[in-house]
Amino acid sequence: MLKVSNKGVIRRLSLRSLRASRTRNIIAVLAVALTTVLFTALFTIAMSINEGFQQSNFRQCGGWSHGTFKYLTEEQFEQLKDEPMISEWGLRRFVGMPTGEAFSKSHVELGYSDANQAHWMFCDPVEGRLPLEGSDEAATDLHVLELLGIEPRLGARFTLTFDVDGRETTQSFSLCGWWEYDEAVVANHVLIPRSRAEAIYDQVGLVPGQAADGMTGTWNLDVMFKNALHIERDVRQVLANHGYQDENPAESNYIATGVNWGYTGAQLADSLDPGTALAVAAVLLLIIFTGYLIIYNVFQISVTNDIRFYGMLKTIGTTPAQLRRIISLQALLLSLIGIPLGLLCGLSLIHI
């Protein structure tokens, strides 16, 4: 049997059949587009809900850095911050907490945070800026200013009495910036320069690393990895790369760590058991299969309307394989128009 090259003929038949049924094709394209809009909206809304949930979690956690290496010495901090696995890092050094009746119902922390750390803790000034090194400046939120009875004005002077590892001290500061108060955030912060924090340690006689609470004056390294899928695993790998561990506090190479539980992807990846994985896969397959059935039924109705045309083609010798190719080409062309149109419409509607 001779093999005849008839791909061009099949293409022309498919295109001419489409041109002969313009109204039907417009309806088919609209059906595909509307189905695509439906699923675009579904997935985008799901992602928006997840993002809102994460943001709420971050505020409860106190920030959105991936993980934390806690209570480090300066040497440990210098070692870990240059780890290639870490894409960004931020430094935080705790100084103390304000005392007095005004602060009895508020959790306020005074300390140094670099620009990255301040950003991750939602401490981005809406007026002014973060404090400069070598100055007596401080930045805080509007709630702390309200507790102090201070009007939010750049350059305003205020005095704060606070506890530094059991030693009370009173210090004066110049307001250099402030940000809005967020009730969802657990802790309020008063940020001061690193030089001022170290000066306060010296004034109260605190030697970093020898604080009674084990926390004041230490270096806390908050980090961001390339992604948030396996935060706990990545934190432990960083420790292992430098000969440390976070499981046995009795060992000399122990470093305390924290993992940001606000990331839903990390929670899912770290606790994903076979049953959960199957359930997630089943839901995704169901959604995809539902979309396939909707579009398939639209094309099935279109093909049924042309049954006489395909019968005539079969009578004159067109094989079933060739008929399938004609129908597949039509489906492909209509999908190439309908799916991008649906994606554009879906994304446009969501951003209105």
Predicted regions and their residues:
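Hydrophobic positions within alpha-helical transmembrane segments of bacterial inner-membrane proteins
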Residues: T36, G291-Y292, N297, A331, ...
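N-terminal Sec/SRP start-transfer signal
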Residues: M1-F39, S328, L332
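Interfacial "coupling" helices/loops that link adjacent transmembrane helices in transporter permeases
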Residues: L293-L334
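N-terminal membrane-entry
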Residues: D270-I287
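Basic-flanked hydrophobic alpha-helices used for secretion and membrane insertion
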Residues: M47, E51-Q267
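Short amphipathic alpha-helical coupling elements at transmembrane boundaries
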Residues: R16-A20, Q54-F58, M312-T315
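Conserved small/polar residues in nucleotide/adenosyl-binding loops
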Residues: H351-I352
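Alpha-helical transmembrane segments
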Residues: R24-I26, L34-G62, Q300
